[in-house]
């Protein structure tokens, strides 16, 4: 595992200014991605901190950012944010539709100050539609897109994939793609725009290939009945003798043949395409994996093309030899964390700073962004009472 260091070049987005109106989930992660790529991300924290109550020193989604504290409900709070928006390339907010407008920092108000601004809106349901004003979380968003119903054992309830599928894959990544595409347009035309990134849209979009297979008759619309959803005995997970698991993805004929050879099940070579015998094959594979521990099977498949890997825990993953060799994880200030991704040959990225502490960077941002109003106390009475 590598140790984070400050690179001479901070990434391909060096020079891009981003304002993040503090929230939870996909918005902060999207802003972290931009910060990892070198953007100067200023997080506007609210007094009292975020609702999740995570120790700010360990909130890794705030790494590589700077923080100021602004009370948007104070008389001069909106003006301070508008001052930042006037100097920014991108603004990200994750409020319910209409909230930013009521706070005085909606897109029309921001664009009046900065017509080139890319205004990114991150929500679950989107800016319009019957559910737009309703509360929700990742699990509800992915439920209505059909993607949650694809995951899990056919004889049990849908499996909950943490909040990676909806919040981050269907949300954060699409917001980042959207604001960067809009930034490209703004720099070419001088005109900014609003990016409506909805988790329901992004998650549905992720299933495009599956919908094509469904239309072609190559996908059954029931969980655990298909090649890639656990229905196939040579694409799934198997328990080992020590209660751990191995992941198998031996789809292609030559990978399948090597898989069977290393398992000692060569007599099942003709079972690969015979769906009627998949149950028999699954039982045979499961029995073989139960005969040894996970680490023993890892050694058996080491160096092969059988497409088999151990299922690791979060704490185990940084120590995997391949990930360690690539420095997939890094350490900064004693916190082990995934390193920025992807990688760039000419503009390398790095974990430059740890999680931003609320309000700790106000003076530096006021100086660098030429916004001295940030240094003025919003509520002198509150300060006197402290």
What are these regions (language model features)?
Residues 214-225, 320-330:
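Short, surface-exposed loop/helix-turn segments at secondary-structure junctions
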Residues 1-178, 182-191, 353-357, 361-386:
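N-terminal helix-loop segment corresponding to the beta1-alpha1 unit
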Residues 125-126, 199-204, 242-244, 250-255, ...:
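Glycine-rich beta-alpha junction loops
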Residues 149-163, 218-233:
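Glycine-/small-residue-rich "gating" segment that lines the acyl/pantetheine channel
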Residues 2, 7-9, 51-58, 314-360:
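Active-site-adjacent capping/gating segments
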Residues 229, 234-304, 308, 375-377, ...:
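Aromatic-enriched alpha-helical interface/lid elements that frame and gate functional surfaces
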Residues 171-192, 205, 209-217, 260-266:
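Oxidoreductase and adenylate-handling cofactor-binding alpha/beta cores
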Residues 192-200:
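Beta-strand segments within the central parallel beta-sheet cores of soluble alpha/beta enzyme folds
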């Amino acid at each position: 595992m590598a140790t984070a260091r400050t690179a001479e070049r901070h990434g391909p987005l060096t020079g891009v200014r981003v304002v993040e109106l503090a929230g939870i989930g996909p918005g902060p992660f999207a802003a972290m991605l931009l910060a990892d790529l070198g953007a100067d991300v200023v997080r506007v924290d609210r007094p009292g901190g975020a609702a999740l109550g995570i120790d700010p020193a360990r909130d890794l989604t705030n790494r590589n950012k700077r923080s100021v504290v602004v009370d948007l409900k104070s008389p001069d709070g909106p003006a301070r944010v508008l001052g930042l928006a006037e100097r920014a390339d991108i603004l990200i907010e994750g409020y319910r539709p209409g909230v930013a407008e009521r706070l005085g920092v909606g897109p029309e108000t921001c664009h009046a100050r900065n017509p080139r601004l890319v205004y990114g809106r991150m929500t679950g349901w989107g800016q319009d539609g019957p559910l737009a004003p309703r509360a929700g979380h990742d699990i509800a968003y992915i439920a209505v897109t059909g993607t949650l119903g694809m995951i899990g054992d056919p004889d049990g309830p849908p499996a909950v994939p943490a909040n990676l599928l909806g919040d981050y894959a269907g949300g954060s990544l699409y917001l980042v793609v959207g604001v960067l595409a809009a930034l490209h347009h703004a720099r070419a035309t001088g005109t900014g725009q609003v990016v409506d990134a909805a988790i329901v849209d992004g998650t549905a979009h992720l299933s495009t290939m599956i919908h094509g297979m469904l239309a072609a008759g190559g996908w059954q619309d029931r969980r655990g009945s298909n090649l890639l959803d656990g229905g196939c005995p040579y694409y799934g997970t198997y328990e080992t003798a020590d209660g751990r698991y191995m992941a198998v993805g031996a789809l292609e004929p030559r990978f399948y043949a090597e898989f069977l050879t290393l398992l000692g099940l060569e007599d099942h070579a003709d079972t690969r395409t015979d769906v009627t015998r998949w149950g028999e094959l699954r039982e045979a594979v499961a029995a073989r994996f139960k005969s040894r521990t996970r680490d023993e099977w890892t050694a058996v498949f080491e160096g092969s093309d059988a497409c088999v890997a151990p299922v690791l825990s979060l704490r185990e993953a940084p120590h995997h030899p391949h990930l360690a060799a690539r420095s997939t994880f890094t350490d900064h200030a004693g916190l082990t964390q995934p390193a920025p991704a992807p990688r760039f040959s000419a503009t390398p990225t790095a974990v430059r700073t740890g999680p931003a502490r609320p309000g700790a960077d106000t003076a530096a941002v006021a100086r660098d962004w030429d916004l001295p109003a940030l240094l003025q106390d919003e509520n002198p009475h509150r300060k006197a009472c402290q």
